[in-house]
Amino acid sequence: MLRTIKGSMGAAILATLLSSGVYAAAEYKLTFSTYWPTSYGYLIDPIFSFADKVKKRSNGRVEIEVFHSKQLFGGKEEYGALERGDIDMSAPLGDYNSGVLPELGISSMPFLFPSPRAFQNALDAGLWDLGINQAMEAKGVKVLNVAAGGPYQLYGKGFSIRKPADLKGQKIAVSGSATSRAMELAGASPTAMSSGDLYVALQRGTIDATARPLITGLGRKLYEVLDNITEVNMSYFETFLAINLNTWNKLPPDLQEVIQKAADERSQEQLKMLEAYMVDAKGIYEENGVTYHIASPTELGEFQQAVAPVYDWWRGQVSDGDKYIDFAKKNQ
C-alpha cells in the first residue's frame, strides 16, 4: 500500500513539474553547433524553436543545447565536425560543402528557382532524395530536413552593378564553387570567403564586392562598409538540419519520431520568416544609406546570358546533373 501511495504521489509531482515546464534530468543531451549569430533571425530562431519543441514534446527526455555565433565551429567546419561526431547536430549550408559533394551545387544554378517558395517546393518534393541524402548518410550524417535559405544578391563598394560588365576585374567574395564560376563568367575575380570575414575585407579593400543573401548584409552590418546592392535573386542557399548518424541510432524510435516531426516543421517556419524578411530588407538597407536597385527584366536577361555556361560546367562535375535540374524545374 505504501508503495502504491508513493507511486501515486510521484506521478502527481511529475505531472505538476511537466505542466509547469520543469523536467527531470534529460536522458539524452545533444550538442548543436552553428556559426550563425543571433542577428541571423530567420535562420537561427527556427533552430531555437526546434530545440524547444523537442524538449517539450519529449517531456524533457531530450535536451538540445544550441551553441551559436561560432562558439564551437565555423560555418565551413560544421559538416566535418558532424561527420566525426564532435557535435551531435548542426544545420550546415549546402553551399559551403559543394566542393566535397558537388551535387549540392544544384541550389546555386543561376536563375533556376524564381522564388524561395519554389525552391522549398522542390526540396519538399524530394530534390535531395535523388542522391544527396544517401551520400551524406554513407558518411555518417542523417539529414532530417532541408530549408530554403534565401536568394543571392550582388553587393558593391563604391560602384553600382547593373550589368555583368560592371563586375569586370572586381574582386568579389563568394561562398561556393558554382557561384565562383558564375562570377568568373561575369568577368570578376572571385575569392572564397566566409561571411564573418566580409566586413573587414570590405573595410580594408581586400574585396570590392560580394554575392550574398540579404541576411548576410544586415546580420553582418555590411551596410556600414558598402553602398550598393542589386537584387537579382541569382541563386539560392539552403540549410540542412542534420544529426550524427551514431547519435540518431542511439535514440529510441519514439524520440526519433519527436525529433523528425519538429525538424519537418522547421522548414515552413523558416520559409515564412524568410519571405517576410525579404519584404522588409530593402527599406532597412535604404535607411542605412545603401542604394538598393532591383534589376529590370532587361538587366536580368544580360546576367542570365552571361552565367548560363555554369550549367554545363556543373554537369561536368555531376554525372547525373540533368536529373537534378529536371526534377527542380518540374517540382516548383
Please place each PLM-identified region on the residue numbering.
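Positively charged n-region of N-terminal signal peptides that target proteins for export
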Residues: 1-7
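Bacterial N-terminal signal peptides
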Residues: 8-20
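N-terminal secretory/targeting leader peptides
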Residues: 10, 25-119, 127, 134-332
